[in-house]
């Protein structure tokens, strides 16, 4: 039985965000690096750096937190895994869902790599819906 690396990084980021931690360390694979690049480009995380420990590569993510002293702390990251190893979810480019009217993003795995819903619509290709982020 294999590991679901995408679910692992989503859970790590969600737990760190709820615990108000600023830094998260996740295992580095090709898939996680591509997903993290999308999160960085879309502004959901502040910084990424690669770290090696005992011949294993890790990604160290710096999360973006919105702090307001008048109101209580609010999580800014909502992540949901959609397609999973036991139930794969595929969509063509016309049926890719819009999250919060385009505010959130859908991350897809396509034949041209991992990309956001906007990029997939522009290139007119569908794929496996990996996760929603809003």
Curated annotation (Swiss-Prot):
Coiled-coil residue spans: none
Major location category of this protein: plastid
Compartments it resides in: Plastid, Chloroplast
PROSITE patterns per UniProt: RIBOSOMAL_S8
Disulfide bonds: none
Alphabetical keyword list: Chloroplast, Plastid, Ribonucleoprotein, Ribosomal protein, RNA-binding, rRNA-binding
An MF annotation (GO) of this entry: structural constituent of ribosome
Database matches in Pfam families: Ribosomal_S8 (PF00410)
GO biological process terms on file: translation
Recorded GO CC terms: chloroplast; ribonucleoprotein complex; ribosome
Record's subunit section: Part of the 30S ribosomal subunit.
Functional description taken from the UniProt entry: One of the primary rRNA binding proteins, it binds directly to 16S rRNA central domain where it helps coordinate assembly of the platform of the 30S subunit.
Family of this protein: Belongs to the universal ribosomal protein uS8 family.
Family annotation (PANTHER family): 40S RIBOSOMAL PROTEIN S15A (PTHR11758)
NCBIfam families to which the protein is assigned, alphabetical: PRK00136.1 (NF001109)
Protein name: Small ribosomal subunit protein uS8c
Taxonomic source organism: Panax ginseng
Gene: rps8
């Amino acid at each position: 039985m294999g590991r679901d690396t995408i679910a692992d990084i989503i859970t790590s980021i969600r737990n760190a965000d709820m615990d108000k931690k600023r830094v998260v360390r996740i295992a580095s694979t090709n898939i996680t690096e591509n997903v993290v690049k999308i999160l960085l480009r879309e502004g959901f995380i502040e910084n990424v750096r690669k770290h090696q420990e005992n011949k294993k590569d890790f990604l160290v993510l710096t999360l973006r937190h919105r702090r307001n002293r008048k109101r209580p702390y609010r999580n800014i990251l909502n992540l949901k895994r959609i397609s999973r190893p036991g139930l794969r979810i595929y969509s063509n480019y016309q049926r890719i869902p819009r999250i919060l009217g385009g505010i959130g993003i859908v991350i897809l795995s396509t034949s041209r790599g991992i990309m956001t819903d906007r990029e997939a619509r522009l290139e007119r290709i569908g794929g496996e819906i990996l996760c929603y982020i809003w």
